Amino acid sequence: MSNQEFAQRWQGVMIDSYGTPGLSFVRGEGSTLWDADGTAYTDFVSGLAVNALGHAHPAVVGAVSRQIASLGHISNFYSAEPTITLAERLIELFGRPGRVFFCNSGAEANETAFKIGRLTGRSRIVAAQSGFHGRTMGSLALTGQPAKREPFLPLPGDVTHVPYGDAEALRAAVTEDTAMVILEPIQGESGVVVPPKGYLRAAREITEATGTLLVLDEVQTGIGRTGHWFAAQAEGVEADVVTLAKGLGGGLPLGAAVAFGRAAELMTPGHHASTFGGNPVSCARTRVLDTIAADGLLDRVKQLGSAPDEWSVRDAAAIRWSPMSGAGLMLGIVLNEPLAPQVQLAAQKAGFLVNVPAPDVVRLIPPLVIEETEVDAFLQALPGLLDAVHERDREGQTGE
């Protein structure tokens, strides 16, 4: 069956919330995907920063296969070893006592944080403009992107959005009535936006001064994506709640809210639940964490993430784009013109899958196991792709 045939079947039965996909994939291995037509692509999207170990990693396949063969779903009326082990491993990575609530996604993890904030007895919440925390009604209320919010108004209330990266604006908005501040260490969905150095530390100081919880949404930045287990570790910032998903499950639905100090004690039985949260099969992906550690992937991510930045500075003038933004293997190619969708299509035709979070940004979030040769191949092809897109755009404007 071809890509076109899959697209026709999709159109017949799926709600049109994504648009009709042009590609249908049938197999993956490492950083390579094969579509229904047999074409191979180097994957710089990794399921939107989900497949930390790439596709069909033997350690993950083995762990999940063994777990599903012995115990699948049991509900949270009971406990299972994989769930407890993963929670213990996360607390170990944070290096301080805490408690974990497992769920299925980043949006659900942020809904959990929302509830923890309200359990302080305060109601006001401060979030960032252009921030993204999910599409459920509560997480959408936290999201600072009007285009995503407006079709669903009114949303759960008392959320104030302030400019991202502006510590003084944050300071002015946070008072002793503020329940929590929620921020991304790097804004992913708005274009891989990195705040000024010291911003997260300032947020920690502001929230501590007012008794406000600091929630860091590490759904995209966590689990090694930036070269640290958690991006905030680069600044030594410790939040009251950290939300996780994407790379945590390594390909299966898994999210978590990890709470510390008083935030870890606010929820009691009956306050919250998730039917599939902590599913033993999803939690068997502890092997993701073990493999990242055993294979030295954090250092490798830092090294791979630095190479394209040096390259972009060297060749920026020739190919009309600014130096890459981001950290580790969460990178944004910031174009000087809003041509990112055209670049995405050109890259796809050349055998590379990339993502477009903004009209002028091409996002690279490949598996952490991507080979250096695969990165080099993309970087070698990129100037030609950009030149071709720019030339076609120029011809379209002049009518040539």
Swiss-Prot record:
Co-factor binding comment: Binds 1 pyridoxal phosphate per subunit.
Any one annotated GO CC term: cytoplasm
Top EC class, one word: transferase
GO biological process, one term: L-arginine biosynthetic process
Record keywords, A-Z: Amino-acid biosynthesis, Aminotransferase, Arginine biosynthesis, Cytoplasm, Pyridoxal phosphate, Transferase
UniProt pathway annotation: Amino-acid biosynthesis; L-arginine biosynthesis; N(2)-acetyl-L-ornithine from L-glutamate: step 4/4
Localization annotation: Cytoplasm
Binding of pyridoxal 5'-phosphate, residues: 106-107, 132, 217-220, 275
Residues given in the record as N(2)-acetyl-L-ornithine binding sites: 135, 274
Disulfide-linked positions: none
Reactions this protein catalyses: N(2)-acetyl-L-ornithine + 2-oxoglutarate = N-acetyl-L-glutamate 5-semialdehyde + L-glutamate
GO terms assigned for molecular function: identical protein binding; N2-acetyl-L-ornithine:2-oxoglutarate 5-aminotransferase activity; pyridoxal phosphate binding
InterPro entries: AcOrn/SuccOrn_fam, Aminotrans_3, Aminotrans_3_PPA_site, Class-III_PLP-dep_AT, PyrdxlP-dep_Trfase, PyrdxlP-dep_Trfase_major, PyrdxlP-dep_Trfase_small
Keyword Transferase attributed: yes
UniProt keyword annotation of Phosphoprotein present: no
Pfam family, one: Aminotran_3
Cofactors that this protein relies on: pyridoxal 5'-phosphate
Modified residue annotations for N6-(pyridoxal phosphate)lysine: 246
HAMAP family from the UniProt entry: ArgD_aminotrans_3
Miscellaneous field: May also have succinyldiaminopimelate aminotransferase activity, thus carrying out the corresponding step in lysine biosynthesis.
Family: Belongs to the class-III pyridoxal-phosphate-dependent aminotransferase family. ArgD subfamily.
Subunit structure, as described in the record: Homodimer.
Protein name per UniProt: Acetylornithine aminotransferase
